[in-house]
Amino acid sequence: MGRKKIQIQRITDERNRQVTFTKRKFGLMKKAYELSVLCDCEIALIIFNHSNKLFQYASTDMDKVLLKYTEYNEPHESRTNADIIETLRKKGFNGCDSPEPDGEDSLEQSPLLEDKYRRASEELDGLFRRYGSSVPAPNFAMPVTVPVSNQSSMQFSNPSSSLVTPSLVTSSLTDPRLLSPQQPALQRNSVSPGLPQRPASAGAMLGRDLNSANGACPNPVGNGYVSARASPGLLPVANGNGLNKVIPAKSPPPPTHNTQLGAPSRKPDLRVITSQGGKGLMHHLNNAQRLGVSQSTHSLTTPVVSVATPSLLSQGLPFSSMPTAYNTDYQLPSAELSSLPAFSSPAGLALGNVTAWQQPQQPQQPQPPQPPQSQPQPPQPQPQQPPQQQPHLVPVSLSNLIPGSPLPHVGAALTVTTHPHISIKSEPVSPSRERSPAPPPPAVFPAARPEPGEGLSSPAGGSYETGDRDDGRGDFGPTLGLLRPAPEPEAEGSAVKRMRLDTWTLK
């Protein structure tokens, strides 16, 4: 970009004239300095402005230069304005146009120099247009979370298909030439049993693989439970590749079945995933209602689930809110739970009401239920049991526990494999504070294998269940079976257990 061209004529504006004088005076003195240094000469510059104000410049001493000037009588070159204008016209320059110098540089700019600069600028522009597109863009990876709603219901017919309604699809906006580690993706299910996926964060989407069957990865949580703190809406529970169940927070679920078990050779995983999206889950319920039960004869081998999440009470879910001082990493080593008829009833298999008595070496015969008015009996001594075996608290959660859902296959039984020196008992709970029908007395059965036709009915509510939910209709009972062990290592006698049962019942 060249300098601004001005006409070489008197400037009428006082302010512009003063500015131009200051700039060009400094430029003239700068040129005189350069000339005196470069060419080893003496220069004396005397300037009077339009108001007769003196400005002078001397390379050495003004008096000495003026003395030499007055005493010099040799012929010399002397020029005026007319001589300069004539010289410029001979060289092809227009004497009427001159570039406006700045305060730092008063170098005269010729048209040849301008053409040179213009050609250089055009060449640079051509290079940018030619090679600008091949400049590699900066490589970056940006995880983008996109909610996806799958309208197809064919995914539930494949055992290895994952739940994507609603799901979080994590894509990376990255350069194809970039080989950077991808961010951990938020996925619903783990398709590979040996490589379970882990969630990237614990914000709006909490997911964890409770994969105790293959032992590929340990449980990262110390007490073994998955928090559901960011789930004000629905809580889907997924077992294995497709064993999915959706539990609404404050209303009874519709009579739907979405039971999809993996292959028999693969032990299914039990996963608890919470999400804040509710529309996609309602669409998932509609798809599951049309599908029905496809494969319900497979067995759930080793589920691991926790019922000690404190924030589930505020959601109104029928889970037990036991303190986390207990061992909450519960396992059911071999529980063939596929189709119990008692699971289909609304009040079947409630929390903490299944009483299983097992002596150290032999199972005890079934006993009739004790009335609440019976007197406590004195305790009887019983052989102590080794304290090194830690019993486990076993809650069982299946997708066919949804109330009001019929089961096509009946005949499987509940098998609880325990150590021969472990006594498993169940502590009863107080009567329900919700609107529910009159509860029948709890049934007592041995821990070996009950008959398929026997139902495990109990009251629909409990002391570990919240009683101030918004919708407490009686047809929505708990859907977890809970086997509670003795907290102390020394076992008690049957009379002491009956006394404790009566004491809890009277409360």
From Swiss-Prot:
<keyword id="KW-0524">Neurogenesis</keyword>
<dbReference type="GO" id="GO:0007512">
    <property type="term" value="P:adult heart development"/>
</dbReference>
<dbReference type="GO" id="GO:0005737">
    <property type="term" value="C:cytoplasm"/>
</dbReference>
<feature type="modified residue" description="Phosphoserine">
    <location>
        <position position="251"/>
    </location>
</feature>
<feature type="region of interest" description="Disordered">
    <location>
        <begin position="174"/>
        <end position="207"/>
    </location>
</feature>
<feature type="modified residue" description="N6-acetyllysine; alternate">
    <location>
        <position position="425"/>
    </location>
</feature>
<dbReference type="GO" id="GO:0003677">
    <property type="term" value="F:DNA binding"/>
</dbReference>
<keyword id="KW-0010">Activator</keyword>
<dbReference type="GO" id="GO:0140297">
    <property type="term" value="F:DNA-binding transcription factor binding"/>
</dbReference>
<dbReference type="GO" id="GO:0035914">
    <property type="term" value="P:skeletal muscle cell differentiation"/>
</dbReference>
<dbReference type="InterPro" id="IPR033896">
    <property type="entry name" value="MEF2-like_N"/>
</dbReference>
<dbReference type="GO" id="GO:0019899">
    <property type="term" value="F:enzyme binding"/>
</dbReference>
<keyword id="KW-0221">Differentiation</keyword>
<dbReference type="GO" id="GO:0006915">
    <property type="term" value="P:apoptotic process"/>
</dbReference>
<keyword id="KW-0053">Apoptosis</keyword>
<keyword id="KW-0238">DNA-binding</keyword>
<dbReference type="Pfam" id="PF12347">
    <property type="entry name" value="HJURP_C"/>
</dbReference>
<feature type="region of interest" description="Disordered">
    <location>
        <begin position="244"/>
        <end position="267"/>
    </location>
</feature>
<feature type="modified residue" description="Phosphoserine">
    <location>
        <position position="180"/>
    </location>
</feature>
<feature type="domain" description="MADS-box">
    <location>
        <begin position="3"/>
        <end position="57"/>
    </location>
</feature>
<dbReference type="GO" id="GO:0000977">
    <property type="term" value="F:RNA polymerase II transcription regulatory region sequence-specific DNA binding"/>
</dbReference>
<feature type="region of interest" description="Disordered">
    <location>
        <begin position="423"/>
        <end position="507"/>
    </location>
</feature>
<dbReference type="GO" id="GO:0001958">
    <property type="term" value="P:endochondral ossification"/>
</dbReference>
<dbReference type="GO" id="GO:0030154">
    <property type="term" value="P:cell differentiation"/>
</dbReference>
<keyword id="KW-0007">Acetylation</keyword>
<dbReference type="GO" id="GO:0002062">
    <property type="term" value="P:chondrocyte differentiation"/>
</dbReference>
<dbReference type="GO" id="GO:0005634">
    <property type="term" value="C:nucleus"/>
</dbReference>
<comment type="subunit">
    <text>Forms a complex with class II HDACs in undifferentiating cells. On myogenic differentiation, HDACs are released into the cytoplasm allowing MEF2s to interact with other proteins for activation. Interacts with HDAC4 (in undifferentiating cells); the interaction translocates MEF2D to nuclear dots. Forms a heterodimer with MEF2A. Interacts with MAPK7; the interaction phosphorylates but does not activate MEF2D. Interacts with MYOG. Interacts with CCAR2 and HDAC3.</text>
</comment>
<feature type="modified residue" description="Phosphoserine">
    <location>
        <position position="110"/>
    </location>
</feature>
<keyword id="KW-0217">Developmental protein</keyword>
<feature type="compositionally biased region" description="Pro residues">
    <location>
        <begin position="363"/>
        <end position="389"/>
    </location>
</feature>
<protein>
    <recommendedName>
        <fullName>Myocyte-specific enhancer factor 2D</fullName>
    </recommendedName>
</protein>
<keyword id="KW-0832">Ubl conjugation</keyword>
<dbReference type="InterPro" id="IPR022102">
    <property type="entry name" value="HJURP_C"/>
</dbReference>
<keyword id="KW-1017">Isopeptide bond</keyword>
<dbReference type="GO" id="GO:0045893">
    <property type="term" value="P:positive regulation of DNA-templated transcription"/>
</dbReference>
<keyword id="KW-0597">Phosphoprotein</keyword>
<dbReference type="InterPro" id="IPR002100">
    <property type="entry name" value="TF_MADSbox"/>
</dbReference>
<dbReference type="GO" id="GO:0061629">
    <property type="term" value="F:RNA polymerase II-specific DNA-binding transcription factor binding"/>
</dbReference>
<feature type="modified residue" description="Phosphoserine">
    <location>
        <position position="430"/>
    </location>
</feature>
<feature type="modified residue" description="Phosphoserine; by PKA">
    <location>
        <position position="190"/>
    </location>
</feature>
<dbReference type="GO" id="GO:0045944">
    <property type="term" value="P:positive regulation of transcription by RNA polymerase II"/>
</dbReference>
